[in-house]
């Protein structure tokens, strides 16, 4: 599986809330930086699992993938994500995710998100 295929599988797993598949594709020392108004950073596979458990009330409704750009061990994806929060009110966000891979696993994710007005 090449890096683009790995990221496409991970994106599909995010779309389907398939945490097991996501965790299978990340390193034990994964770092996920969310560069939004909260500025959250998740470090390590165990903390990533805890993050997904904590935010399980957020449901993915749909996404677009406008671009998938691959440069050796870095992959960038952008588009629009449609979600429902714990209040069940739908909302949309623009996103750009940058993935860094080492030996076929994601070692770092940087997510830029901005709520669509």
Language model feature labels by segment:
Residues 2, 15, 33, 39, ...:
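A beta-strand edge to alpha-helix "cap/lid" segment located at domain peripheries
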Residues 6-13:
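Solvent-exposed, amphipathic alpha-helical segments
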Residues 16-33:
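Short, well-ordered alpha-helical segments enriched in acidic and aromatic residues
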Residues 26, 38-39:
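Outer-membrane beta-barrel domain signature
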Residues 42:
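Short aromatic/basic micro-patch
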């Amino acid at each position: 599986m090449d890096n683009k295929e790995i990221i496409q599988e991970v994106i599909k797993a995010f779309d389907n809330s398939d945490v097991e598949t996501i965790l299978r594709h990340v390193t034990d020392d994964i770092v996920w930086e969310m560069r939004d108004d909260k500025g959250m950073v998740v470090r390590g596979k165990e903390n990533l699992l805890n993050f997904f458990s904590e935010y399980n009330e957020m449901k993915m409704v749909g996404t677009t993938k406008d671009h998938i750009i691959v440069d050796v061990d870095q992959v960038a994806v952008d588009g629009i994500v449609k979600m429902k929060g714990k209040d069940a009110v739908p909302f949309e966000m623009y996103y750009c995710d940058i993935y860094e891979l080492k030996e076929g696993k994601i070692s770092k994710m940087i997510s830029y998100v901005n709520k669509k007005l």
